[in-house]
């Protein structure tokens, strides 16, 4: 826990287990979109626990990190050797800033209510800007795969399938509002 970031807990009847799966979730989303750590520089906006977890996971997978201006900057972190000044190919925004760069795939950590059909909702979150629903789904899958039920990892749905199910649930729930 060199990152000092935990976002998942598990009680097994005898003790507590913890994990920080933000970084694993981001790596899974990027992999789903064809962006692998070894081939892409990750731009990070943020310096809190989620950003530290993401930087650590990206570095462990052989990636390089470019921290972009944010409220908190990294200081004395174990992955300093993975830091670069090279321009990022992909960006994750944990500070909810207006990062505008049409040349890179952007993942925002936040999401807001949407209107529309399932197809319209899917189109809204699959362009050059991915909203936080991607991270929400990827983190939950990572929790199940790594912490809650690793023995059932092969039974988990794919990231795309679970995201589609989330959009279908949101669309259905909107009909009751």
Where do the PLM segments sit?
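Glycine-rich adenosine-cofactor-binding loop
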Residues: 20-23, 30, 34-63, 67, ...
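A general structural motif
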Residues: 38-41, 87-88, 101-104, 126
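Short acidic low-complexity segments
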Residues: 71-100
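Rossmann-fold NAD(P) dinucleotide-binding segment
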Residues: 87, 94-121
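Adenosine-phosphate binding glycine-rich loop
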Residues: 109-177
């Amino acid at each position: 826990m060199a990152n000092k970031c935990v976002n998942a807990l598990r009680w097994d009847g005898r003790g507590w287990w913890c994990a920080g799966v933000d970084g694993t979730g981001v790596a899974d989303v990027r992999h789903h979109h064809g962006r692998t750590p070894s081939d892409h520089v990750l731009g990070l906006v943020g310096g809190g626990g989620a950003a530290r977890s993401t930087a650590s996971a990206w570095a462990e997978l052989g990636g390089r990190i470019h921290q972009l201006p944010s409220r908190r900057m990294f200081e004395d972190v174990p992955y300093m050797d993975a830091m670069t000044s090279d321009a990022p190919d992909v960006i994750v925004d944990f500070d909810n800033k207006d990062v505008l760069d049409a040349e890179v795939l952007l993942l925002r950590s936040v999401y807001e209510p949407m209107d529309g059909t399932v197809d319209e909702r899917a189109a809204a979150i699959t362009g050059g800007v991915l909203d936080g629903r991607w991270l929400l789904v990827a983190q939950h899958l990572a929790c199940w795969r790594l912490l809650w039920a690793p023995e059932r990892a092969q039974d988990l749905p794919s990231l795309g399938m679970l995201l589609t199910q989330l959009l279908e649930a949101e669309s259905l729930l909107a009909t009751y509002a």
